[in-house]
Amino acid sequence: SHGSHETDEEF
């Protein structure tokens, strides 16, 4: 989503 580094949770 946002600035995911690995997956796409909330990072």
Swiss-Prot record:
In response to mitochondrial stress, the precursor protein is ubiquitinated by the SIFI complex in the cytoplasm before mitochondrial import, leading to its degradation. Within the SIFI complex, UBR4 initiates ubiquitin chain that are further elongated or branched by KCMF1. It is found in: Mitochondrion inner membrane. Pathway: Energy metabolism; oxidative phosphorylation. GO terms for biological process: oxidative phosphorylation. One of its GO terms (cellular component) is mitochondrial inner membrane. GO terms for molecular function: metal ion binding. The keyword Mitochondrion applies. It comes from the Eukaryota. Keywords: Heme, Iron, Membrane, Metal-binding, Mitochondrion, Mitochondrion inner membrane, Ubl conjugation. It is a peripheral membrane protein. The keyword Membrane applies. Transmembrane segments: none annotated. Component of the cytochrome c oxidase, the last enzyme in the mitochondrial electron transport chain which drives oxidative phosphorylation. The respiratory chain contains 3 multisubunit complexes succinate dehydrogenase (complex II, CII), ubiquinol-cytochrome c oxidoreductase (cytochrome b-c1 complex, complex III, CIII) and cytochrome c oxidase (complex IV, CIV), that cooperate to transfer electrons derived from NADH and succinate to molecular oxygen, creating an electrochemical gradient over the inner membrane that drives transmembrane transport and the ATP synthase. Component of the cytochrome c oxidase (complex IV, CIV), a multisubunit enzyme composed of 14 subunits. The complex is composed of a catalytic core of 3 subunits MT-CO1, MT-CO2 and MT-CO3, encoded in the mitochondrial DNA, and 11 supernumerary subunits COX4I, COX5A, COX5B, COX6A, COX6B, COX6C, COX7A, COX7B, COX7C, COX8 and NDUFA4, which are encoded in the nuclear genome. Belongs to the cytochrome c oxidase subunit 5A family. This is Cytochrome c oxidase subunit 5A, mitochondrial. It comes from Canis lupus familiaris. The gene is COX5A.
